[in-house]
Amino acid sequence: MANLNHIGIYVKNLEKSLEFYDELFGFKVVNSFTSGEAKISMIDIGGGTLELVQRPGSPAAPPDGNWSHVALHDPKFDETVAKLDEKGIPKRLVPMGNGSSLCFFSDLDGHVIEIMEKDF
């Protein structure tokens, strides 16, 4: 069976995006390289990789609505929600029937991130 290798998203500022994901989740760079004019960093998101691509002239979040979100199980859910509050990042908390919550917010480039208190 095939498995997920990585999810790639465009960002406006690679360095700021790397800092954002490191400060919130502790995600670390596992590889960085260039491809033509694009600067690319791969970050370990625990069980997969998120590819951040900074390419001159490319929009960050897709304007056509074909992109939904990336969902992450976060064992430090409450801590991360508190960090979002500290940074003034707007969020939407959604209570689940299993006694846990989901939290939706946007990264620096408008990509929607969902954090899950418990796995499904």
Residue ranges and their predicted role:
Residues 30, 42, 81-120:
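Vicinal oxygen chelate
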Residues 5, 38-39, 68, 99-101:
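Residue-level marker for the onset of beta-strands and adjacent loop->beta junctions
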Residues 2, 9-50:
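Core segments of cupin and vicinal oxygen chelate
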Residues 67-81:
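Mid-chain, well-packed structural core segment of small domains
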Residues 1-15, 68-72, 119:
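N-terminal beta-strand motif that seeds the catalytic metal site of vicinal oxygen chelate
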